[in-house]
Amino acid sequence: MSLRGFLGALISASLVSACGGGNDEPSGHSQPDAGGEDASDASAADAGDDGSIDDASVPDAPADAPVDTDATTACGTASECALADEQRASDKMDSIVNDPTALGQFLTAVPKGGDLHNHLSGAVWAETYLGWAKSEGNYCITNSSLALSTSCGNTSTTSPVPTAADSLWLPVIRAWSMQDFVAGAETGHDHFFATFGKFGAISGSAHHAKGLADVMQRADSENALYLEPMLFSNSTAGNVGSAVWSGGTLTTAALPGFHAALLAYSGWNAAVQAIVTDITNTESGARQELGCDGSSPDSACRVGSRYMVYISRSGSGPAVFAQMVAAFEAAKIEPRLVALNLVGPEDGSTALSAYDRQMEMLGYLHTAYAGKSPLHVTLHAGEITTKYLPTSYNIANINHIRKAVEVAHAERIGHGVDVLGESNPTELLYELQQLGVMVEIGLSSNTQILEVDGTNHPLATYLQYEVPVALATDDQGVSRSSMAGEYMRAVQDQKLDYKTLKLMARTSLEKAFLPGPSLWTSFEALEAVTECAPTASSYYGEDPAPAACQTYLDTSDKAAMQWELERRFREFEAKQ
């Protein structure tokens, strides 16, 4: 079975409403075959509410047929032909919406634009981590917690890293992910966030290159073009911040002076350079893993990527601020670094108490670095519900989304589940629409962490108010999902149609932090720059692009990626 056929099989019969069943890794690149009780033996009838992906046996998709983009066919102009193909693809999806196998294959093949909300450590599947740990040989499993460890001297408290044939295999996968999870004494919220500590011994910077290569392969196999993974924290900068600050609570008024002190500190340049070094090592290592510079490069080498720094919400004020400053400084010299984000449970005690102060830090830096650093800001905000909020807080007074946008100047929002719980939500929705703030939608993790899905999810509301939205994986390894899995949820749980999925894919690239101007002069009207405007004989995505258009595309990474998305849509739709 081809890789694409394999992935179609994995997605098929899965994610009906909130259900999922299989346990297999959805990429055939580095996973050992699961055995025993692993997902290869699970059936759709055993599907649970963990968002996992079912492995239904389906035949390979037929080989790709050549695409006829000749505008002289009976449909009329090139534009008319392209729109006719689009409608045929839409009709095709409508006709198979109740056939999970066919729908899974269809959605795996659909072009998906970019995955803009992707935590690298949570994107790698448990089976992959176990394979690395087994092959490297210096790891073991702590019996009491099922966490990976390098302290393996006591054989009475640790066990060897399991293989698929071992009885410990499935319990470890369940501990490291949402596989087969059923809420009880432990909530989905708590289990989800606890997984990261279980595999933390192998998810750090030493394995970022292998992790990035793995995620690029999975993206390519599902026809995604672009990634913006959250890759790097910067403990070096955090340590500098803690060392430099000695004034008690870091107030907003003290930020300018502390900022200057950081820049003057003798070890500061090394803290900034640590980010640049991490990016260089990770990207070059991933390219080496994929053979991108060799004679037979992996097709995943064509997946574009830019990177984010992530900062834990639970850090001390001086450490968090220093990490923010380091990111703004690093972006001045490293163009592959495009954004920062704050991570960790938004309803944690420190995250709640420090939220306003952290937004003020970003607001200060927005002004301080205006015109000096190209760094963007995207923030987790609104990933919160009353169920997990401490009783001392009134959710209507939280207003995390509003503060992220108005105070911290976030250009994108991650999750935004609580938008209707904020004060004056209608005004906020209009503000998001007017400012063009995109919401990164993670349907699987919203179901698993917050228990929000179906009509309780705000995705339909965002679409109603024309707020830009795009689907994202969040932590696909922990969730046991993928981009195709998120598309399946969007269709089956959120009842989205083909043209809405296509709009969201286009939106993901329009709102990506790629350099260069957009292909579109009016994204809403789908009107391109003059050089790339349709003619009677050419339409968006023409291959090759018209000469004047190609000249424009050569000046903009963003526009070039957008044109490639249109080309893939043309190719996909012509086959339906």
What are these regions (language model features)?
Residues S12-A13, D68, A74, E542:
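Residue-level signal for mature regions of secreted extracellular proteins and peptides
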Residues T73-Q576:
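Metal-cofactor-binding active-site regions of metalloenzymes
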Residues L7-L10, G22-D24, S30, E37-D38, ...:
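Compositionally biased, intrinsically disordered low-complexity regions
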